[in-house]
Amino acid sequence: MPPPQRFRVQSKNYFLTYPRCTIPKEEALSQLQKIHTTTNKKFIKVCEERHDNGEPHLHALIQFEGKFICTNKRLFDLVSTTRSAHFHPNIQGAKSSSDVKEYIDKDGVTIEWGQFQVDGRSARGGQQSANDSYAKALNADSIESALTILKEEQPKDYVLQNHNIRSNLERIFFKVPEPWVPPFPLSSFVNIPVVMQDWVDDYFGRGSAARPERPISIIVEGDSRTGKTMWARALGPHNYLSGHLDFNSLVYSNSVEYNVIDDITPNYLKLKDWKELIGEQKDWQSNCKYGKPVQIKGGIPSIVLCNPGEGSSYKDFLNKEEKPALHNWTIHNAIFVTLTAPLYQSTAQDCQT
């Protein structure tokens, strides 16, 4: 009679099933994390399910850094914290970690730890058709979910075509942003300096056909909480660029009447698109962090908002000796206003910036 076969599993990916297991998924994950193994764990996912008759069971996927040899069939046993009970799993080595992950994701509720490791031998990573993967990506609920699907199912495309994939998904998942609704009506700003009001009347008081080919921009400097941001954003449809420039179609539109440039340092704007934005240039390109260069229609003025002080003030920046050319250009393309008081009177607007 041959000796009984010794238990032995050798794999980078382990698929565990715990029948009739009442241990919560959080506790199961904690216990699996604490099990000592000679190979480091990289990822654990636990799924808590119930059969139609209400009977509970757990599934778990464990990914190791390299192949792990298990000769102890009790190694992955779980212990109840509420009663004297042990739960022993069915232990299998999984060639396709992605297939196991997809299987345990279908039903029940899951919890995970670590970073999922894409397996090049996975049926989802190689044998499954690209059409299936991309169809699933199109049906995802977000760009990030779609990228995750392609990373797991089409890793070659994800690595070699990431730039194009991301750019295409941004266009596919594009949703027109909800129009911004100002919290305060324009009529509540009663302390507008004459030069600012003249600028508003000159630009917004005309129809689009009667406006100049390259209207003048305006640079407004003032302390925080003077109402300059809320005033600028209450004038009409606009692009709001704050902190940095982003011409991604998700946040920038070519169909607005003006730009609001808020808290963007003059040094940063000089390195980017100073003359294009302040000079109302038409039909120019700007690069996005991801994706192809964006074509900007332009031809609209900018309201530049800044605080006084070194590094923030556009006036101080332009008055430096080394910038006479930029100074002369800017004063021909924009007017400067320095606020000495809030643009509003009501204390209800003290939160304005």
Curated annotation (Swiss-Prot):
Specify which residues bind a divalent metal cation according to the UniProt entry for this protein: E49, H57, H59, D107
> Which residue numbers delimit the CRESS-DNA virus Rep endonuclease domain?
8-116
The domain-related comment in the record is: There are 3 rolling circle replication (RCR) motifs. RCR-2 is probably involved in metal coordination. RCR-3 is required for phosphodiester bond cleavage for initiation of RCR.
Q: Which family does it belong to?
A: Belongs to the geminiviridae Rep protein family.
What is the recorded function of this protein according to its Swiss-Prot or TrEMBL entry?
Essential for the replication of viral ssDNA. The closed circular ssDNA genome is first converted to a superhelical dsDNA. Rep binds a specific region at the genome origin of replication. It introduces an endonucleolytic nick within the conserved sequence 5'-TAATATTAC-3' in the intergenic region of the genome present in all geminiviruses, thereby initiating the rolling circle replication (RCR). Following cleavage, binds covalently to the 5'-phosphate of DNA as a tyrosyl ester. The cleavage gives rise to a free 3'-OH that serves as a primer for the cellular DNA polymerase.
Please list the residues that bind ATP.
Answer: G222, D223, S224, R225, T226, G227, K228, T229
Organism, by scientific name, is Bean golden yellow mosaic virus (isolate Puerto Rico)
What's the chief localization of this chain? Answer: host cell
Where in this protein would one find the motif RCR-2, according to its record?
57-59
* Entry's cofactor comment: Divalent metal cations, possibly Mg(2+) or Mn(2+).
Q: Which GO terms describe its biological process?
A: DNA replication
| Pfam families per UniProt | Gemini_AL1 (PF00799), Gemini_AL1_M (PF08283)
Ranges for the region named Binding to RBR1 are 143-153
What quaternary arrangement does the UniProt entry report?
Answer: Homooligomer. Interacts with the replication enhancer protein (REn). Interacts with host retinoblastoma-related protein 1 (RBR1), and may thereby induce the transcription of host replicative enzymes even if the cell is not dividing anymore. Interacts with host PCNA. Interacts with host SCE1 protein.
Q: Which SUPFAM superfamilies match?
A: Origin of replication-binding domain, RBD-like
- Which Enzyme Commission number(s) are listed? 2.7.7.-, 3.1.21.-
Q: Where is this motif: RCR-3?
A: 103-106
Region (Oligomerization) location: 156-176
Required cofactor names:
Mg(2+); Mn(2+)
What cellular-component terms does GO give this entry? host cell nucleus
**Active site at which residues?**
Y103
| Name the UniProt record assigns to this protein | Replication-associated protein
